């Protein structure tokens, strides 16, 4: 999968802040498992899941890539298209959190 394919899938999950993000976290965990990356999924607040993945050797140092998957509700916003479907218009991509965390997560996963 390329970055745009991953982003399209991530945006399709309705991870509105007061709802669960479990299915999205499981999707990412399964995606990483294809590359032999071990993950841990654990629940923070009820219905809100965190995913921990570690790549590389057990040595001092390293880097942490951290993000969030929740989005604010779209009610009352003037979306012309479905905010949970990635749309390309004039060489730009539109979708809920396409340029925020879901975009970042797609780049990291690609």
Protein language model features and the residues they cover:
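Active-site alpha-helical elements of protease catalytic centers
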Residues: 97-110
């Amino acid at each position: 999968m390329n970055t745009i394919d991953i982003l399209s899938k991530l945006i399709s999950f309705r991870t509105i802040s007061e709802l669960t993000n479990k299915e999205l976290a499981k999707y990412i965990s399964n995606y990483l498992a294809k590359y032999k990356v071990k993950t841990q999924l654990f629940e923070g607040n009820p219905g809100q899941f965190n995913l921990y993945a570690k790549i590389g050797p057990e040595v001092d140092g390293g880097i942490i890539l951290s993000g969030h998957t929740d989005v604010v509700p779209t009610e009352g916003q003037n979306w012309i298209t479905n905010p949970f479907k990635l749309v390309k218009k004039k060489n730009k991509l539109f979708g809920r959190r396409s340029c925020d965390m879901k975009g970042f997560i797609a780049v990291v996963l690609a």
